From Swiss-Prot:
GO molecular function term, any single one: rRNA binding
Role noted for this protein: Binds to 23S rRNA.
Subunit (UniProt): Part of the 50S ribosomal subunit.
Organism: Selaginella uncinata
Compositional bias annotation for Polar residues: 22-32
Subcellular location as annotated: Plastid, Chloroplast
Protein name per UniProt: Large ribosomal subunit protein uL23cz/uL23cy
Region: Disordered, residue numbers: 1-37
Biological process annotations from GO: translation
Family recorded in the similarity comment: Belongs to the universal ribosomal protein uL23 family.
Highest taxon in the source lineage: Eukaryota
């Protein structure tokens, strides 16, 4: 999707589609406005709100198990959609949209 990397499948994220919300990891640099424009390029997708937070960076471990640095911090976006405007996650099911 350009800016949005992959959907998240945590316990909370699995329950979000019931409330027309979707959680995904995103590149750390784009703003909420840029991500909104990229997602709304899909036909019939309109966004009501975007919430984001930055995940903590983890320790990068070397070959001997010692900490050698930090991994890159990532951003997580929770997108709320308008009613009857789903994101096409699974092509081929219900006209390519998840309801």
């Amino acid at each position: 999707m350009g800016g949005v990397e992959n959907p998240v499948s945590t316990d909370k994220a699995i329950r979000l589609p019931e409330r027309k919300q979707y959680s995904s990891n995103a590149e750390p640099n784009p703003s909420k406005t840029e991500v909104k424009r990229r997602i709304e390029r899909f036909p019939r997708v309109r966004i009501v709100a975007i919430n984001s937070h930055r995940l903590p960076a983890g320790a990068a471990r070397g070959s001997a198990g010692s900490v050698t640095g930090r991994r890159v911090r990532r951003k997580r976006m929770i997108t709320t959609l308008r009613l009857n405007h789903p994101i096409p996650l699974f092509p081929g099911k219900q006209n390519g949209f998840v309801s």
